[in-house]
Amino acid sequence: MRPLEGVRVLDLSRVVAGPVAGRILSDLGADVIKVEPPEGDITRIWGEERNGVAGFFLQQNAGKRNISIDLRKPAGVQLVTDLAAKADMVIENFRGGVMDRMGIGWSVLSAVNPKLVMCSISGFGQTGPEAHRQAYASVIQAESGLVHRHATLDGRRPTDPVTSFADYNAGLHGTIALLAALHAARATNVGTHIDLAMLDSMMFTDDYLHHAIDDSEIVRLGGEYWQTADGNWFEIAGQFQFVWAKLKLAFDLVDPTPKDAELEIKIASRRNIVREFIANHPNADAAIAMANKAGLPWGRYNSPEQAIATPTAVHRGIVTQIDDRAGGQRGIVQSPYRFNNYESGVIGRSPHRGEDNAEILADWLNTTPASITQLLTDEVLLTQSQ
């Protein structure tokens, strides 16, 4: 049994932020229906394509069922409205106001389903001076101050991180809000509309933003990277004063600077001593043994390929295998939830566009085969071949 078995989710979102929320809910047992436009989700062409499924689309949409609907047609709008009437949750990530203009906004959907909970994920919110703006993760990472901080601290030109932090933050917070709203709706029989901005989510999860609020100087609290004799790097966590004290105690390191020297001079001297001490270790394994002896927390400087192959990653099943659509298996990152008495995790395959049209309409709406055929003929419903 899975925690969310019996929960129905209509996922109108695309790209990453909304689909992440849908993927999590699916892994937890919900029946998640991805509604895809005729042109397909843009992530269908991002990443390596195997058997008609690209890597980005696979990661965010595996386990969902798929229906392709043309929302430019009145019959398509009606179909989504009918599906929402049977759903517990709706996820969408259009710009503010777009759902209303399409005729499937909150006022319409809540009228046909008063217990519905709907999460609208946008860059800058459903209302406000910039609600109309388009947003991707890179836009929010620039606007939130994240890129500026890293560029300033590292003394380099601004570059976007090679990870969609803003998308995943929004997806995770959207999932939390949806589950809270579902709990309330089941207790009160009253649904709710969640206005979740990627900017809000990004800034809430920024543990350094208090420096800007307090107008105080940023002090980096993370660890430092050190190099061993063979040129490999590894990380020791904690502020340098903590690292120095541990190494000094464990290995009798000596700082030759006078006791009355300026603090900056002492720190520079001790940093050089630690750098030379670690550089005398032949490789990362030797340095890790040293860190363990000193009682210091450490981390390997892994490539992504190394990270997914570590003993812990393998033991935890961080990468699992699903149907590759050609009789084989394909790797995918597993969701991180491990319950002691429930099942969880991705199951099934990543769907082709419109692959489950007939099955979904029969399951949710009891639509007849003849009606489904007519919807296909009228190109209200579409398939990947169209």
Question: Model regions: which residues?
Answer:
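Aromatic-enriched alpha-helical interface/lid elements that frame and gate functional surfaces
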Residues: 222-294, 298, 385
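A glycine-rich dinucleotide-binding beta-alpha-beta segment and adjacent secondary-structure elements
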Residues: 294-346
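N-terminal helix-loop segment corresponding to the beta1-alpha1 unit
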Residues: 1-187, 285, 352, 358-386
